[in-house]
UniProtKB/Swiss-Prot annotation:
Any Pfam family: DUF520
Keyword match Nucleotide-binding: yes
SUPFAM superfamilies hit by this protein: YajQ-like
MF term (GO), any: nucleotide binding
Its job: Nucleotide-binding protein.
NCBIfam families named in the record: PRK05412.1
Keyword Protein transport: no
Entry-linked PANTHER family: UPF0234 PROTEIN YAJQ
Domain of life per record: Bacteria
Family: Belongs to the YajQ family.
Protein name: Nucleotide-binding protein Pmen_0939
């Protein structure tokens, strides 16, 4: 039976390239030079600046470099800024994988559409199976048309 998997993954190389581009952009900006920094560890960024409005500008720089590298900004989760001594800091994490709640929403959305496919949760992915390839393509179109709050990819399409 034909099937495909619904996953939410980040390309780590593109993410590091986007962060490096954001750091270069930060060094080029005259108003932010020397006053701000971006530190990267795994899937977490720490933005450091003298004022909160600078953090917002840095966040915009990070978003624009993510978009240039074709990474969806929905996977980025910015926490509230906090004061650390004389500087302001902000944590930015990148979410990856489909959690249980989102997987349940995806399965419910497919079932509500009454397509001739079955969806099953398998860890951090959702497996969709059907009798015909056309039914699976309808399911992909249905999922692309709905906003789930996370970027979704469709892989392992098998006949």
């Amino acid at each position: 039976m034909p099937s495909f998997d619904v996953v939410s993954e980040l390309d780590k190389h593109e993410l590091t390239n986007a962060v490096d581009n954001a750091i270069k952009e930060l060094d080029r900006r005259f108003d932010l030079r020397g006053k701000c920094s971006i530190e990267s560890k795994d899937k977490t960024l720490t933005l450091t600046a003298e004022a909160e409005f600078m953090l917002e500008q840095m966040l915009d720089i990070v978003r624009s470099s993510l978009i240039k590298r074709k990474i969806d900004c929905q996977c980025m989760e910015a926490k509230d800024p906090y004061a650390s001594g004389k500087v302001m800091k902000q944590e930015v994490t990148f979410r990856e994988g489909i959690d249980k709640e989102l997987a349940k929403k995806i399965v419910a959305h497919i079932k509500d559409a009454k397509l001739k496919v079955q969806a099953a949760i398998q860890g951090e992915q959702v497996r969709v199976t059907g009798k015909k390839r056309d039914d699976l393509q309808e399911a992909i179109a249905l999922l692309r048309g709905h906003e789930f709050g996370m970027p979704l990819q469709y892989n392992n399409f098998r006949d």
